[in-house]
Amino acid sequence: MKTKFFYFLLALSFVLVSCEQSNKPTKDPVPEQLTSINDMYDSFKSCLSLNYDEGMTVTFKREDRSNEDFTVDESFNEYESEEGESVGYAALSIVSNNWEIDIELYAEGGYGETYEGAYISIAGTSTNKADYECEPQIIHSKDKIYLKDEATGQYICVLQKGVGIIYMEDNAGHTWDAL
């Protein structure tokens, strides 16, 4: 009888762990092949810009504390080079009483080549907060962009096309979910 009960508890714990993990972003997305600078730019733009206007409020929930309201301090999509060439670019800065989060995504092209990059910073506004700063690897999936820290292997930020940021993780392992 004790053996059956033990196996029941073991199976139940496996189910609970599986359910909890299914709510986190996919850790091994299938990359989407982007073939041109325009594809990259459109992908970035749809992730960052649609629901982020300067002055608006966005709310995140960190797993160990109450909701945190951020104000969109800066949001822009595109700039041109000095030669007037269009360069894909998307950037977002959101601030609260406790945090400042900056995300930049950029895609540049020329001479038949394309290049993309990203930068993210999650900085506390007081000394006892966890800070995070890196230039992550960009992974494109069907409807999301994953920013992966190559040093730690963690997905520091996930952006959903047409929505914006849906998930972040700082270097202390705290997860931030958009509400």
Which residues does each predicted region cover?
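Conserved functional acidic sites
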Residues: 23-179
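Sec-dependent signal peptide recognition
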Residues: 2-9
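C-terminal motif of bacterial Sec signal peptides marking the signal peptidase cleavage site
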Residues: 15-18
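N-terminal hydrophobic targeting signals that begin at the initiator methionine
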Residues: 1-2, 20
